[in-house]
């Protein structure tokens, strides 16, 4: 039976999120390089992004990977001084559970 890298990770292990600005996505490599968890976004204005979709392969769900993607995306919004529209239900949930002032002040309806 094959085991992935994450099978042996404990929850406190750091998950490396990569940001591909050209593709407008955040991703985490899973199981070597074949599987990826991704968070997609689009610019909908000069200083506004729409955080559209988060996807984690079924076999890797429930391990906190989406949370790392959401944090990276919201931190990007803060660092770049952008506004964010949250189309993705998971990011809406993440911000509700982590209502940091720097996140809340950048939300667009």
UniProtKB/Swiss-Prot annotation:
The protein's name in its UniProt record: Protein NATD1
Superkingdom of the source species: Eukaryota
Gene: natd1
Start and end residues of each N-acetyltransferase domain: 18-108
Family to which this protein belongs: Belongs to the NATD1 family.
SUPFAM superfamilies, A to Z: Acyl-CoA N-acyltransferases (Nat)
Species in which this protein is naturally found: Xenopus tropicalis
InterPro entries, sorted: Acyl_CoA_acyltransferase (IPR016181), Gcn5-rel_NAT (IPR045057), GNAT_YJDJ (IPR031165)
């Amino acid at each position: 039976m094959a085991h992935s890298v994450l099978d042996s990770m404990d929850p406190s292990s750091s998950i490396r999120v990569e940001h591909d600005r050209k593709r407008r996505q955040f991703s985490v490599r899973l199981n070597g390089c074949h599987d990826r968890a991704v968070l997609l976004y689009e610019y909908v204005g000069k200083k506004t992004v729409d955080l559209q979709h988060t996807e984690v392969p079924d076999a890797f769900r429930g391990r906190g990977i989406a949370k790392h993607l959401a944090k990276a995306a919201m931190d990007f919004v803060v660092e770049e001084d952008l506004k964010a529209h949250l189309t993705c239900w998971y990011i809406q949930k993440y911000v509700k559970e982590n209502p940091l002032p720097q996140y809340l002040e950048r939300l667009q309806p």
